[in-house]
């Protein structure tokens, strides 16, 4: 449980866990993605759904296979519902806190980064597991957009004036 306390951000409530029937069920939120996991006396399993597809395409499947070679702890997989997910599992005997931390970091950051990239590039992919996301009001989006534009213009003006 101390591991989850270490990961938890009190303001964001990014880690939720409960103990039930000798198992720990947990969710970790990173950006737009949610990783769910189960830990018991023998094994730890974590999964984050990245996107959903109705048809398999050689383009995105090759991209994911290539990515698998660069991952150290996790791997991309396709579940029975045609969800592309990134998974990690280990036996408790091999699961040091160091390994769990870096595996969870690798899994969540890759899921959060790649969902938008893959969905944008491959039109047959659809977003999945996004019910926890809250859309910002249009007024707030405008304020943030205008702020970014003003900062970019100020930076460009500063560069141009030397």
Where are the language model's segments positioned?
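Generic alpha-helical secondary structure
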Residues: 1-4, 57-61, 100
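Short, internal acidic amphipathic alpha-helical interface segments
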Residues: 47-83
């Amino acid at each position: 449980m101390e591991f989850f306390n270490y990961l938890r951000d009190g303001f964001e409530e990014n880690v939720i866990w409960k103990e039930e029937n000798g198992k720990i069920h947990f969710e970790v939120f990173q950006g737009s993605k949610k990783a769910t996991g189960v830990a018991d006396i023998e094994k730890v399993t974590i999964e984050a759904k990245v996107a959903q597809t109705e048809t398999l395409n050689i383009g995105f499947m090759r991209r994911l296979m290539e990515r698998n070679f660069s991952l150290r702890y996790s791997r991309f997989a396709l579940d029975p519902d045609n969800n592309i997910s990134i998974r990690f599992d280990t036996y408790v005997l091999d699961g040091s806190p160091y390994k769990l931390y870096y595996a969870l970091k690798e899994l969540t950051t890759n899921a959060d980064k790649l969902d938008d990239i893959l969905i944008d590039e491959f039109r047959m992919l659809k977003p999945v597991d996004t019910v926890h996301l809250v859309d910002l009001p249009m007024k707030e989006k405008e304020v943030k957009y205008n702020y970014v534009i003003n900062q970019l213009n100020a930076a460009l003006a500063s560069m141009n004036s030397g």
